[in-house]
Amino acid sequence: MNALRSPLTIHRIFHPTDFSKDSQVAFAHALRLALAFRAELTIMHVDPAVSPEGFEDFPRIRPTLARWGLLPESSSKGDVTKLGIRIRKVRALASDAKHAIVHHLTASPTVLMVLATHQHEGFARWLHHALAEPVSREMQVRTLFVPSHVEGFVSRETGQTRLQRLLLPISIQPPSQ
């Protein structure tokens, strides 16, 4: 007899960012999901040349939540916690982003990874090293890929969600979960 499965619980979300516009779209999705699940959100940036001190260039949490109408303009970090989420920012000084992300996820496993993915075609596919898919595959973590040049289902301006279609890939091998 099959036991009843409990609803999906996501308590930790990981969002690697390169600070591009595409990553800003993925950030909005990661933040909105963290709010929905009352989860911890870890935002990570890997750079070979930037000092690990300071996080001024990271996506701005409180201004985003204020724009979404969830916090007042003059909110504090404590106000973010009252929304039921916890934010961690990680900067890795490394030349190999894939290796740094895999190392971080091995030390601090996550339930869901949300990241932008760039769809290269033709010759460009040979020149650019894929990051999103290999990390997801190697770490075997649930992943929300936010393709480049799309707005996705979360409005960056309002935080409102709009989902019309959902595609679930199903595979016999490996067994679906």
How should each PLM-predicted stretch be described?
Residues A30, S76, I101:
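Aromatic/hydrophobic pocket-lining residues that form π-stacking "cages" and hydrophobic walls in ligand
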Residues V80-R88:
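A short helix-to-beta-strand connector/capping loop
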Residues M1-L4, R32, V102-S155:
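Gly/Ser-rich helix-loop-strand patches that form or flank binding pockets
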Residues V90-A100:
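Charged docking surfaces used in two-component/phosphorelay signaling
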